[in-house]
Structure formats: structure tokens, C-alpha cells
Amino acid sequence: MWINRLVKHPSYSVLRFYTKRLCTVSVKSLREFGVLPNSTICHSVYPRRTYVMGRAVINDILIKKSYSTHTVCAIDRSKDENNGSAYDKFEAKGIPIDVHTLKRIISSSGMDESEFSKSISYLFAKTVDPEPKDVLSLEDLSFLLNKLYTQRFQIRRICRDINAKYSEFWFKLFSLYAEKVDAKRNQVNLRNTKLDACEIFDANLMIKNFIELGQLGKAQKILSFILDRNPDILLSPKNADISTIVHFLQLRCGALAPYWKIPDNSEQKQGFLRKMVRLGAKNTSIRLSSTYKAMDHQTLLKIADLALQEKKLLNSEDLLSTLIQSFGHLGQTQILERCIEHIWQISPQEFPSHVVIKHRGCYPSSKILVSILVSFYFNDHDLHRGLSILDSFIKHYPDVKLDALFWRRLFQLSHFAWTPANDKKATSVVRCWHLMKQWYASKRLRPSVDYETLRQLYDIMKKTGNFPLGIDVLRSFKPGIERTRAENAGKVNNIIIKYQKCIIKELVNRGRFSAVREFIDNYGFDRKMTKDLNIFCANRMFLRSKKMKNKIENKKEREKVRLDSFDDDEDDGMIIGSLW
């Protein structure tokens, strides 16, 4: 989070910096939606300064920031917690932006800049400060931008309803923000045009949003906005910002693994080229751009050199993960192996390069292991080297936590690497399934339900006819499925129904009717589903009996035709014989 960057400055300089910045803001109290003690007015009062500063320390709570920087010292953390609590009270009691107001603002994104600016001022007055303002300050707009980001999913639904472009609304908002950033520097006639920590954080928040939308061109423009004003933000040990470096690696060095095109051997047909798929193609949480390519190879090596020397960069899980993906995308697997050995002392050989393992960077996480696995598969088109290194990590770092994304990627890659002509039963994928069960059993945990993992295993079950695998999957995920169904997850429910119908169909076709009844009793999950499965089972049994009946009748008909043909041949033989 951006306030962490200020730890390296003396406390008095930080206080002086923010005192100077916040003195330009009106200290007039703003009405909040709360209750003052011993008051009947039903409005509590906090100065604007309190919750502007408070916004800076609730990034991980309110904004759900998915990447972190170096650790804040204990003294600064205790001070920041007080500011955060004041802001949290404001947000807890505050009324979210209503739908009517959001529609008005989104509709105004098609207007010119002045009209859009007036609409944003109206939104601020409607939701934060009822005091009318002709022009919003940069701090007000920053606060509003973060508030809108927390409601981005609601904004997306509204955009669909009113047929407005969701990405255009956000880019219009950023354009207004960038204009105010430059106008502020022109007003005070600053020679140093560098963005401050708050502005860098806001810009990176917008980059993250556009990456999620698949709008990489807009994300590139915002990244250039940062780099033009802070040219040393990537390679300076003193001023390096982890969030900006991560986004640079993602946008310009290939560290967006969901965009990578992976060869799918399981769909290869004889005489045809292998089908190329993207890892994120089936993921609905992000949208993928139609094109993606890395552009800057030289800066990557400089960033890697800096990251391997700076402790604060080595402690960033997100930075190391994107660095690994960048090397993988550019085919630099030898450099990648040396980096892994330098940071975690794990080599591609069976044993680690040191007797005593002592990592120099952050403890290996699921995110880092996914990046290693995907990077090696992208270059080798085989899981052998990646799984060998993965096995060493699990052996020598027993506390590593493997989340749902890790297992999803493992099943995706093992499925893509599977060649049906050489392995009809998909034993490599089944082996990964048993590995997952053993890991969760060793940790005494239950596997979390993941749609893509279920879909990959369903495809394997259907292609190989391995219905015991499907039953085993439902048995292992049963507690999670029951919990997910209670939350009304439509996609998971649909894939579960596919499992059930496929297994019932296989059991009925094999005549195992008692096993079908037992399966429905164990995995019906609720009364309605059990009823539907019984109806489906009855239909399949009826179709099977009809098919068997037709098969018997056809067999009798063929036998009769054969006998009649034999009798005719015999009669012909007798006639020909008498003629001779």
C-alpha cells in the first residue's frame, strides 16, 4: 500500500509533507451519516482531514488491494490504526452511492469534459459532502475514485442496463483525475512534477481495474502517465514502487499468464496442428484482450538485478511472481532456474543446492509456485521439469499453502499435456488428482470448490469413461458443494448436474441399478435434485430397456433372414442338381 513507502522517510518529514498537502483542503467539518453522542441531530461530525488521511490506511480492507509492498514498522502501524478506525466508522455508517445517482454519472460519461466534471461534483455532493462545490479538489476526486472502485461491480451492471461503455466511464474519470494532477502542479508552479505516493496508488488502482477488464491499451496509457512523471520509479533502489513494477512487468514484459497461448494435446487430431488455448479463456472473473505481446526485454533484466539485491523487493510475493512469469514468457528458463536457486535454494536436480534451506526472499506461496509451473510448461510443453521443482518446494518448504488457483492450473496443464493416443486412461491427470487428495489429507483440510477444477476433471471423466473418478470427485468435494449450493452458485450447480447425469448414464448402461440408487441417495444434495435425478434415471432405464428390446428383435430378425436365405440356397441347389 502506498503509505508503506513513506516508512523510509523520517516521521517529521512525512508529517510535514501531509500537513502541507492537507492545509489546502478546507477544514470545514463535513456531515456524515452517523449519530453524535447525546445529540438528536443524528449527524456526527469529522473534519475532512481525518478521513482523507484515513483513506490511505484502509487499502487492504476497503479497496481489496491484491498486491502488497514492504512491511510497515510497528510505530507507524499503531498510528495508522487510529486514522483507519475513524475512516471505517465513516464507511460503516455511510450510505453507498444510490443507483439513480450512478446512472446519472455513467450517462454523463458521453458528454464533454466540463459537463462530466460537473456531474462528478454533483456525485461528491450527493454522497460525501452536501456542501456544493463548483470544482472538486484533487483530494476530493481521489476519495471519490476509491469509493467508486469499491462499487465497480454494481457500476458494471448499471452500464449493461443502460447500454453504456463501462471502460469508457472509468477512463473518462481517470482523464479528469490526470488533468487535476497536472493543474495542481501548474498552479503552485512546481519544478518537480513527480507524482506523490497517493497519486501513484490511485493510478495503479486504475491500471488494475483496466487489466481486469482486458483493456490493456488504456492500462498502458495510465502506466505511461506514471513513468513520464516518475522516470526513476522502476529502477531506483530509493524510489522503486512495487505496484508500478508489477504492472510494468504485466503490461510490457509478458507477466500475464492468463493471456499465454498453450498447446492443447488432448484436442489434437491426426494430421492437424495442435489447438492453442489461453489459460484464462474460461475464467469469467477477468476479460481477455484479443492481442497481447511483451515489448520491453532490456528493462526486465535491470528490474531482476534490482529485485535480487533489495530486501524489500524480495519480500514481495507479487513482484517475484510476475518476475518469474516474465522470464517464462521470454523463454529465459536458465535465468529463471538461477533466480529460483538464488532466492529459495531449490535447483532442478532432485536435491536442493544447499544442505540447509534458507530462503532469501518471501516464503514460497501458491502464487509463486503457479508462476513456476506455468512458466516451465510454456517453454517445455511438458510438466516434467515444473513438477520436479514443485516437488522440491513442497518437500523443503512444508508450510507452503496451495490454494484453489494452484490446483486449477495443475489440472489445466496436465489436461493440456495429456495425449490420448499414448495414454488412453489419462493416468497423468488422475495422478495429479490423487496428489491433491493426499496434500489436503496431510494438512487435514477440505478441498475448496473451484469451478474450473471441476470442469477439467469432468472432461477427463467423460473422455475416458472413468466414472469412478467422477464419484471420487463428488465425494471429496461434497461438503464444499453443499456449502456452495447454499450460496446459490449457478455455474458450480450446473457442472455438478453434468457429473451426476454422466455417472448415472454410465451406471445404467452397465446395468448396475443398485449402484445408481445408492449414488442418487448419497449425492442428491437436496429433495428437488434427488427427484430430478430419479426422473432422469427412470428415463435412462426406459431408453436402455427399449434399446435392449430393439437389439433382441433386430437379432431375431437377422437370424430369420439368415435362415430364410439358407433355405433358398438349399432349394436352388436341389433344382440345379436335378437338372444335371
From Swiss-Prot:
Quote the protein name from its UniProt record.
ATPase expression protein 2, mitochondrial
Q: Which domain of life is it from?
A: Eukaryota
Q: Write down the Pfam families for this protein, in alphabetical order.
A: ATP13
Please describe the quaternary structure of this protein. Answer: Binds to the 5'UTR of the OLI1 mRNA.
Q: Which family does it belong to?
A: Belongs to the AEP2 family.
Q: Does Chloroplast show up as a keyword for this record?
A: no
Which biological process terms from the Gene Ontology are attached to this UniProt entry? regulation of translation
Keyword tags: Mitochondrion, RNA-binding, Transit peptide, Translation regulation
Q: Which GO terms describe its cellular component?
A: mitochondrion
- Say where the protein is mainly found: mitochondrion
